[in-house]
């Protein structure tokens, strides 16, 4: 059968036409990190072009440096009264690193606070007609199909009602490796097509081989279909976006010829466990302060968080092709945290990267438990530490390098905080158990007194706590100032109680996460790869024995630190207790925060409520209703045996199989493919063949029309008359 005949057959088999549109191949070459590509940066076509205001940088970055310099000077003064010892020098260095990290967030928070006090500007582009084409991409990897396809259904329907639906095409780009989920995706796609084919163009493709994970998934789309579109709007499997936000992003991109990427700040929704609701509340109350401040000062040198953003296809394909790093994982191979790198490369090429902090209606979900957060952070940690290989890239803007550094510090800060705690503990134990050396080997008429300026130290502690909690304080002030905002979370009293509860619970969880991040960093430095595990998104509960195993080292660390503190004094133990209690109670805290029942209890009493929870947007309500409907549609999943037995089902399945060959002609066959070929060839019947396949082999068979046709020709079951003897 020719390609054109096959396309006609697909159109007849699938409602709404073929599973994917005709390909329009385009180049997306891996970018050089060691030299600036020819023709970069591009020249702007408008006056002033891609320029940012230096005054904003001076206020935030300069302010953070001045604040850090003051704090470091004060810390040095605390130790300098009697001369600084080696341990005190170490503590000073660790304090400097940690304080610089929180000072930048504090100064960004100040900027965000004052920006949020202003009235938002009206959207001048709201009525702009779209004459560009945008592909909305929903990558998925072993996710619940009911969640993914129902979300696309409601977003596509809402977008079609705006009058701009003609400017958008929807793509579900699957990297699913589980054969059962792959078949469920096909069932869900058929339902989606039935619902949307009259008003939207929705497509589906499952890659046969998920090279380079999500970045490779999107790159594969770009190389095969990207040239059909002006923009790419990238979502995640748990994303939702209001139609006004989708059209707003496209209108902004169309209006600014220098825009390479526009990133929204997603709100967290649909949290059911206590941990998820804690993250939702914190992100809603404090997140806008940091996000708005960041967007205000980075200006045209913003960042990309991997989803809920629109990208100019020309900029992405021409400047953001990711190279493989030399060596093996975790520091070599494919770039894991691709988003920061893609933003940096797009900016290097002369395009702007903007954070649209003023654009609401962008949503995502969060991990339901500490364990799920740890699994996600292990992967992110590896990707962010891998950015140490990207930092020397030729031609990067200094703000892009700062984004990479902050990503690295998001995880290295935990080992630095732990070292700071241990150094302080060692200083206390040294003063308690070791006799001071008043006269050193060098001649001096005056002794070296191991003393500190306690008043200055206490003052510096208060300053540090103010800087650390500053963004939270700004968020609370904005909440209390805005009566409508306060009412949307249950009123000012409930809001204050929620803030107090969030601070206490976050303080208990923080030391657990510190040790989790320390373990992740250590694992990466030892050369262990994170792999790619699908995320749990709803229930975070786990058996108690599993939690004891996962948190055993955290509890042991808490006991050891507590023992070391009590060797000095009960006062030191009391000072360290906020961190130690969380470690001692790691298992019950992990169990309770991952519980849906406890999450529902706090929801009933109105603690940790958010506006999106109390008064959800219509798109969120419709998504929940549609998900339940999709669950009902696919509650009886197809099996490969059914596909082989039913010719009509086989044709439906083949119409949704990716047409790209598993491997290029002349390239070596992979072991798993060779094994499947042998099993299919040797099989006496379909039943015996299916019994021989493992999940990986089953997924490969589903994606291979030739193997499926070969299996289809076999009898369904073995009968003695069909016995073939081999001599």
Curated annotation (Swiss-Prot):
GO molecular function, one term: hexosyltransferase activity
Domain of life: Bacteria
Keyword Zinc: no
GO biological process: glucan biosynthetic process
UniProt name for this protein: Glucans biosynthesis glucosyltransferase H
GO CC aspect terms: plasma membrane
Enzyme type, top EC level: transferase
Region feature Disordered, mapped onto this chain: 18-42
Function recorded in the entry: Involved in the biosynthesis of osmoregulated periplasmic glucans (OPGs).
Source lineage: Bacteria, Pseudomonadati, Pseudomonadota, Gammaproteobacteria, Alteromonadales
Organism for this UniProt entry: Shewanella sp. (strain MR-4)
Pfam families: Glyco_trans_2_3
Membrane topology: Multi-pass membrane protein
Primary gene name: opgH
């Amino acid at each position: 059968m020719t390609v054109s005949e096959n396309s006609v057959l697909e159109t007849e088999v699938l409602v709404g036409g073929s599973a994917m549109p005709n390909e329009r191949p385009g180049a997306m070459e891996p970018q050089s990190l060691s030299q600036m590509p020819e023709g970069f940066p591009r020249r702007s076509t408008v006056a002033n072009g891609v320029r940012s205001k230096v005054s904003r940088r001076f206020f935030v970055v300069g302010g953070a440096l001045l604040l850090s310099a003051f704090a470091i000077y004060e810390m040095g003064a605390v130790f300098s009264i009697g001369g600084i010892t080696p341990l005190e020098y170490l503590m000073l260095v660790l304090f400097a690193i940690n304080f610089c990290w929180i000072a930048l967030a504090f100064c960004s928070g100040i900027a965000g606070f004052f920006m949020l006090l202003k009235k938002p500007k009206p959207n001048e582009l709201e009525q702009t007609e779209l004459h560009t084409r945008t592909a909305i991409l929903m990558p998925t990897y072993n996710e619940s199909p009911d969640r993914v396809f129902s979300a696309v259904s409601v977003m596509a329907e809402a977008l079609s009602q705006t009058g701009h639906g003609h400017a958008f095409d929807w793509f579900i780009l699957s990297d699913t490796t589980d054969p059962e989920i792959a078949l469920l995706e096909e069932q869900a796609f058929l339902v989606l097509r039935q619902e949307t084919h009259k008003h939207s163009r929705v497509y589906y493709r499952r890659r046969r081989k998920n090279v380079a994970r999500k970045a490779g998934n999107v790159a594969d789309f770009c190389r095969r279909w990207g040239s059909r579109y002006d923009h790419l709007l990238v979502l995640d499997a748990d994303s939702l976006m209001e139609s006004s936000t989708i059209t707003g992003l496209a209108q902004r991109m169309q209006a600014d010829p220098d825009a390479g990427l526009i990133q929204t700040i997603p709100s967290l929704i649909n949290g059911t466990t206590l941990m998820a609701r804690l993250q939702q509340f914190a992100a809603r109350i404090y997140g806008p302060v940091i996000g708005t401040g960041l967007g205000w000062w980075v200006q045209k040198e913003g960042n990309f968080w991997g989803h809920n953003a629109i990208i100019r296809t020309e900029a992405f394909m021409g400047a953001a092709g990711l190279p493989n790093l030399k060596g093996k994982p975790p520091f070599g191979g494919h770039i894991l945290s691709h988003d920061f790198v893609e933003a940096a490369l797009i900016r290097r090429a002369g395009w702007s990267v903007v954070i649209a902090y003023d654009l609401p209606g962008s949503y995502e979900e969060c991990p339901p438990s500490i364990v799920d957060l740890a699994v996600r952070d292990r992967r992110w940690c590896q990707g962010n530490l891998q950015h140490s290989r990207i930092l020397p890239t030729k031609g990067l803007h200094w703000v892009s390098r700062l984004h990479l550094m902050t990503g690295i510090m998001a995880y290295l800060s935990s080992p630095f905080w732990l070292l700071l705690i241990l150094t302080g503990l060692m200083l206390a134990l040294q003063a308690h158990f070791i006799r001071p050396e008043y006269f050193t080997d060098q001649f001096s008429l005056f002794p070296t007194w191991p003393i500190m300026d306690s008043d200055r130290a206490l003052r510096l502690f208060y300053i540090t706590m103010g800087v650390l909690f500053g963004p939270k304080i700004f968020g609370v002030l904005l909440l209390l100032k805005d009566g409508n905002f306060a009412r949307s979370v249950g009123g000012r009293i409930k809001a204050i109680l929620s803030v107090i509860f969030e601070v206490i619970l976050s303080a208990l969880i923080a030391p657990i996460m510190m040790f989790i991040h320390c373990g992740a960093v250590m694992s990466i430095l030892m050369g262990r790869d994170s792999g790619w595990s699908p995320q749990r998104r709803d229930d975070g509960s786990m058996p108690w024995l599993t939690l004891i195993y996962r948190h055993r080292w955290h509890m042991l660390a808490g006991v050891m630190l507590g023992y070391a503190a009590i060797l000095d004094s009960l006062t030191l133990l009391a000072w360290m207790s906020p961190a130690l209690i969380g470690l001692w109670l790691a298992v019950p805290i992990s169990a309770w925060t991952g519980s849906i029942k406890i999450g529902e209890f706090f929801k009933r009493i109105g603690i940790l409520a958010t506006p999106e929870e109390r008064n959800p947007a219509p798109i969120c309500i419709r998504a929940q209703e549609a998900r339940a409907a999709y669950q009902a549609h696919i509650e009886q999943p197809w099996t490969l045996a059914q596909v082989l037995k039913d010719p009509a089902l086989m044709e439906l399945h083949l119409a949704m199989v990716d047409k790209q060959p598993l491997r290029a002609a002349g390239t070596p066959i992979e072991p798993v493919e060779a094994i499947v070929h042998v099993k299919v060839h040797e099989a006496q019947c379909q039943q015996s063949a299916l019994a021989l396949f493992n999940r990986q082999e089953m997924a490969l068979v589903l994606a291979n029309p030739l193997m499926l046709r070969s299996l289809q020709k076999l009898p369904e079951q073995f009968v003695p008359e069909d016995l073939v003897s081999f001599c």
